[in-house]
Amino acid sequence: MKSILLIGMGQFGQILGEKLINMGDEVMIVDKDEDVINLLAPKYTGAVIANCMNADNLKTLDVPSYDVCVVTIADDFQSSLEITSLLKDLGAKYVVSKANTDIQRKFLFH
């Protein structure tokens, strides 16, 4: 069982979250949309309403304590890139970020 921090609970994040739970992982979800978090929270280990573009918000999540941090924000690449960078700066052990193009993948990979 792994501990997963899942940021961005749009369609892809919700599907991934369900699969991770079904595999027995502990999943903490984060999204800036209060309605989404309120709807999904009962299914997950934990749920936080937060804008992860703010480093202080990410610091409260104790990023290094998770085995994997996943960023599933696909419709705003700038946000995805910045959150990925912040997670790495905060000591994330392993970061996975969704990319829609090869160029986005290259930016996120480095």
Task: Please name every model-derived segment.
Residues M1-H110:
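Cytosolic regulatory regions of ion transport systems
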